[in-house]
Amino acid sequence: MTEKLKQGIDQLGLKVPETIQQSMLAFLAFLQKWNQAYNLTAITEIKSMITHHLLDSLSILPYLKGDKILDVGSGAGFPGIPLAFACPEKKFTLIDSKAKKTAFLLQAASRFKITNVTIIQERVGSYQPGFYFDTITCRALGSVREIMEQTNHLLRPGGQWSIMKGTYPEKELRGTDASAIVHVLNVPGLKAERHLVEVKNNKG
């Protein structure tokens, strides 16, 4: 599994220290254990988790902007946890409304000493942190328009939404901000289509 992750990270063109890669794998094992009782993810094998969770999450790393990142509907911690492992200089806030998921994330952050993450249990529409985020990201959570509307109060002017999608979201992009850019994500070992929708926040 170590080699599978290393090869995938190399194929993504990323530089992640081996010690951090080992921590990522340990996190997956921790998730697998919790998943037996709390049903946090439908993917149960470590080999598949590496592809569908770790590498999929890390594929958006080159597109992150700024130092304050919000991961909306983080669930079992994707993409937020892998990105936090890989970018210790950035501050990540992971928000989810479900108690069992935030309980897992709190335990994981403590166990693996992920000091650059903050875990919030709350609906994102009600979240008022008192500051703006530079990038808001999410995976498998609502339409592009819905995500933008629910989080508009949290993104700084000039900041960006980085929304992970499967197939090209043509219908979702109709009527959204004209500055939307769609990147094709090539996730090593993943045959399914993956895209990243980038939308700049033009509010002044």
UniProtKB/Swiss-Prot annotation:
<protein>
    <recommendedName>
        <fullName>Ribosomal RNA small subunit methyltransferase G</fullName>
        <ecNumber>2.1.1.170</ecNumber>
    </recommendedName>
</protein>
<comment type="function">
    <text>Specifically methylates the N7 position of guanine in position 527 of 16S rRNA.</text>
</comment>
<feature type="binding site">
    <location>
        <position position="139"/>
    </location>
    <ligand>
        <name>S-adenosyl-L-methionine</name>
    </ligand>
</feature>
<dbReference type="InterPro" id="IPR029063">
    <property type="entry name" value="SAM-dependent_MTases_sf"/>
</dbReference>
<keyword id="KW-0963">Cytoplasm</keyword>
<keyword id="KW-0489">Methyltransferase</keyword>
<dbReference type="GO" id="GO:0070043">
    <property type="term" value="F:rRNA (guanine-N7-)-methyltransferase activity"/>
</dbReference>
<keyword id="KW-0949">S-adenosyl-L-methionine</keyword>
<keyword id="KW-0808">Transferase</keyword>
<comment type="similarity">
    <text>Belongs to the methyltransferase superfamily. RNA methyltransferase RsmG family.</text>
</comment>
<dbReference type="Pfam" id="PF02527">
    <property type="entry name" value="GidB"/>
</dbReference>
<dbReference type="GO" id="GO:0005829">
    <property type="term" value="C:cytosol"/>
</dbReference>
<feature type="binding site">
    <location>
        <position position="78"/>
    </location>
    <ligand>
        <name>S-adenosyl-L-methionine</name>
    </ligand>
</feature>
<keyword id="KW-0698">rRNA processing</keyword>
<feature type="binding site">
    <location>
        <position position="73"/>
    </location>
    <ligand>
        <name>S-adenosyl-L-methionine</name>
    </ligand>
</feature>
<dbReference type="InterPro" id="IPR003682">
    <property type="entry name" value="rRNA_ssu_MeTfrase_G"/>
</dbReference>
